[in-house]
């Protein structure tokens, strides 16, 4: 092999070695991540966060491509023996699009205001933790947010009406907390696509705002609260709703003239004070789950469609409901 070829091979080897050993991770991001690790008491769950290695290879992280200079775009800490509060340094990851702290029973404190700095955030999941305090109003500043999940925490107080101003929100999941007060009137006027709305297992009270009847939810779950009054505005044959769960509240309205969406696959109204007869129109829906037990319904269960495919547990404990799968009407 001549001298020129040898030099070319040596250059190529040096070039490849340099490229392979070069960190993709931004140094500012790496420094921030190491501060986050320290703030969380250096948990074993983050053992891969070694300052001598490329942080884009660390567990719980994702980096973007060259168009964003390989900045950290996702921080997902799921399970593990993590203790402490949400580190303030989280707000110093400016390219973050996904932030998840989930199934961390020793994560305490409030939802930190530093999160408001994450203007590129599209997904925020803080769930199955011991976070306390209110849902902060500053979340409405995250104008790129598409998915918000704050379920299975100990959050309290009222739901900020400002959440309805999020222009790109597709799902609001606030279930299983200790939220009180009423559902905001503003939730009847989201600026963009109507989001899936899940507010179950809280202590919400009062009537449903009439404004909610103006929009077409795909999924709405208000179950296991203290809501009362009329909920008929959520229905309508012209809507495209797939799932409605109003179970275990104190709703009182007559369903006799309530048409349901012809797209409805899930309907749960159990444990309320709903009256009237089940309309024949309900046989037109492609129901996969159906429960109207523990109400004050009367009359004959309409035949046809899906209504007879459900067993008696979907109908029992009503005032005078009859027909298959219950006893024959007399």
From Swiss-Prot:
It holds the Pfam family LRR_1. GO terms for molecular function: polygalacturonase inhibitor activity. GO terms for cellular component: extracellular region; Golgi apparatus; membrane; plant-type cell wall; plasmodesma; secretory vesicle. It is a peripheral membrane protein. Glycans are attached at residues 106, 130, 238, 291. The keyword Glycoprotein applies. LRR repeats lie at residues 69-93, 94-117, 118-142, 143-166, 167-189, 191-215, 217-237, 238-260, 261-285, 287-309. Keywords: Cell wall, Disulfide bond, Glycoprotein, Leucine-rich repeat, Membrane, Repeat, Secreted, Signal. Disulfide bonds join 25-55, 56-63, 298-320, 322-329. Residues 1-21 form the signal peptide. It is found in: Secreted, Cell wall; Membrane. The keyword Protein transport does not apply. InterPro entries: Leu-rich_rpt, LRR_dom_sf, LRR_N_plant-typ, PGIP. Inhibitor of fungal polygalacturonase. It is an important factor for plant resistance to phytopathogenic fungi. Belongs to the polygalacturonase-inhibiting protein family. PANTHER family: POLYGALACTURONASE INHIBITOR 1, POLYGALACTURONASE INHIBITOR 1-RELATED. This is Polygalacturonase inhibitor 1. It comes from Arabidopsis thaliana. The lineage of its organism: Eukaryota, Viridiplantae, Streptophyta, Embryophyta, Tracheophyta. The gene is PGIP1.
């Amino acid at each position: 092999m001549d001298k020129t070829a040898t030099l070319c091979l040596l250059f190529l080897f040096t070039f490849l070695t340099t490229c392979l050993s070069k960190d993709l991770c931004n140094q500012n991001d790496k420094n921030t991540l190491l501060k986050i690790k320290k703030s969380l008491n250096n948990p074993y769950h983050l053992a891969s966060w070694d300052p001598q290695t490329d942080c884009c290879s660390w567990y719980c992280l994702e980096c973007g491509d060259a168009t964003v200079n390989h900045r950290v775009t996702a921080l997902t800490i799921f399970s593990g023996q993590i203790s402490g509060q949400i580190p303030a340094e989280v707000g110093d990851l400016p390219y973050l699009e996904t932030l998840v702290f989930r199934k961390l029973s020793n994560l305490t404190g409030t939802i930190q205001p530093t999160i408001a700095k994450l203007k590129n955030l599209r997904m925020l999941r803080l769930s199955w933790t011991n976070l306390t305090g209110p849902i902060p109003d500053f979340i409405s500043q995250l104008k790129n947010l598409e998915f918000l999940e704050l379920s299975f925490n100990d959050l309290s107080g009222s739901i900020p009406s400002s959440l309805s101003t999020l222009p790109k929100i597709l799902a609001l999941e606030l279930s299983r907390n200790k939220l009180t007060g009423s559902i905001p009137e503003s939730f009847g006027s989201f600026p963009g696509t109507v989001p899936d709305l899940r507010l179950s297992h809280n202590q919400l009270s009062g009537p449903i705002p009439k404004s909610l009847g103006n929009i077409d939810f795909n999924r709405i779950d208000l179950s296991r609260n203290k809501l009362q009054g009329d909920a008929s505005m959520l229905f309508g044959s012209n809507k495209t709703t797939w799932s409605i769960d109003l179970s275990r509240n104190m709703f009182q309205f007559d369903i006799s003239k309530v048409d349901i969406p012809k797209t409805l696959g899930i309907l749960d109204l159990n444990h309320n004070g709903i009256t009237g007869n089940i309309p024949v129109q309900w046989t037109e829906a492609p129901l996969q789950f159906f429960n109207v037990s523990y109400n004050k319904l009367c009359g004959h269960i309409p035949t046809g469609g899906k209504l007879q495919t459900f067993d008696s547990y979907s109908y029992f404990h009503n005032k005078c409901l009859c027909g298959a799968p219950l006893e024959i009407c007399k």
